[in-house]
Swiss-Prot record:
Family: Belongs to the universal ribosomal protein uL15 family.
Keyword Metal-binding appears in the UniProt entry: no
Domain of life: Bacteria
Protein name from the UniProt record: Large ribosomal subunit protein uL15
InterPro entries: Ribosomal_uL15, Ribosomal_uL15/eL18, Ribosomal_uL15/eL18_sf, Ribosomal_uL15_bac-type
Organism: Cellvibrio japonicus (strain Ueda107)
Subunit structure and binding partners: Part of the 50S ribosomal subunit.
PANTHER family tied to this protein: 50S RIBOSOMAL PROTEIN L15, LARGE RIBOSOMAL SUBUNIT PROTEIN UL15M
Length: 144
């Protein structure tokens, strides 16, 4: 068996419908689109959510919620990602240098996902209870 001899099981692949190629094909002339009307024409279809002029559902329902602007400058860091950082001190600047967060991020929180394999000192970052326990178990410490 070689890659160039592989083929799908018989009946697995259906031939593409070729429309507008004579009445004997069953898809000639109008090509399965019927006669006239919006949907028979090229580019002819109503946009998603259009209900024929009736007030659409997404407009009938009330608006709610908002996007917190502080979430745009906040990042979440996994414990396992701390292993990629050179050195033993972890703060916002070292996270940016390691490429774990973008330059616009101003605050970050470390949460317990994976495991940290080296002793690190966390400075100026929020840390969950589980992550703090894991960092201290690995010989590191968390400073405010």
């Amino acid at each position: 068996m070689r890659l160039n001899t592989l083929s799908p099981a018989p009946g697995r692949i259906h031939a593409k419908k070729r429309v507008g190629r004579g009445i004997g094909s069953g898809l000639g002339k109008t090509a399965g689109r019927g006669h006239k009307g919006l949907k028979s024409r090229s580019g002819g279809s109503v946009r998603p959510g259009f209900e024929g002029g009736q007030m659409p559902l997404q407009i009938r329902l009330p608006k709610y919620g908002f996007t917190s602007r502080i979430s745009l400058v906040t990042a979440e860091i996994r414990l396992s990602e701390l292993n990629a950082i050179e050195g033993s001190v972890v703060d916002i600047e070292t996270l940016k240098q390691a490429g774990l967060i973008s330059s616009v991020i101003k605050r970050a929180k470390i949460f317990a996902s994976g495991e940290v394999k080296k002793a690190v000192t966390v400075k100026g970052l929020a840390v969950t209870k589980g992550a703090k326990a894991a960092i201290e178990a690995a010989g590191g410490k968390v400073e405010e």
